[in-house]
Amino acid sequence: MEKTMRHGITATILLCCSVSAFATTPQIIAHRAGTGDAPENTEYAISKSLENKADAIWITVQLSKDGIPVLYRPSDLNSLTNKSGPVSAYKAKQLAKFDAGYKFSSDSDHPFRNKGLGIPTLEQVLKKYPDTFFYIDLKSPDADPAQQAKELEKVLAKQKAFTRTRFYSTDEAYLNALPKEIQRFESRDKTRTMLANITMAHQCDIPANTDTARWYGLEMRRNVEVVEKYTLGEARSKSVLTWDNEAMKCFRAKSGANITLFGIKTEEDFKQAKELGADGVLVDSPKLFSTFKTN
């Protein structure tokens, strides 16, 4: 009896180890083209991230004054460059001459100033990296959704890039305006609401007829404020939305779910994402995470 139990315990341990050892390794996605290693959203950053074995590149796009999709994130050029004002105030050819590495610092130094790192267009990037998959975050603070969708479709068609791009935005209007041919994530609001219902009410709200491929993206952990309304007022409390096994099971209750976790900062984060079975992780430094991927 004792011998049998000992063998059973050994088998259980081996089984657990096997599951952990063969967990799917998430796709390493370079956030803002690898903002932790180089000036964000530049061709230089893309090249470095690919050298550091990133599986895909996440870039941020806005529309220039002449309606050309360009790679830039903040609402003011002063945040990252040697110029100021919104991206939409300048033509793409002007933006290409601005110093996109001006504000990037390393140990109180600015190693990328005056190195010729301009703001590239989406078309230039897709053409230069024909074998790379790009996740494209739409960040224009003032673009017309319909016009932006038209310009994006034009670029993707010219570069034959419909199958190697997928779009994301915190503004659902930008996603809704995209034509059917353009791949996209589910809306952030929808994803957050589903996760909140799982975390707080243990309620799984996957529609019964959901059986198509779909992509979800959200922070692995996110602080939120819960507002409860009553007849005589309301109550506010802090909470944390967290991806766990219950959440993963719910989101994958129907086939076709692909889950990308944001805000992965440490090796522990990466291990947790891997154990959860995440399909992708958004990281600032592919250089750092390439070492974790092989562990």
Which residues does each PLM region occupy?
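N-terminal signal peptide c-region/cleavage motif recognized by signal peptidases
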Residues: 18-20
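Intrinsically disordered, low-complexity, mixed-charge
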Residues: 13-16
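Phosphate-group recognition and catalysis centered on beta-loop-alpha active-site segments
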Residues: 22-295
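Bacterial N-terminal signal peptides that target proteins for export
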Residues: 2-10
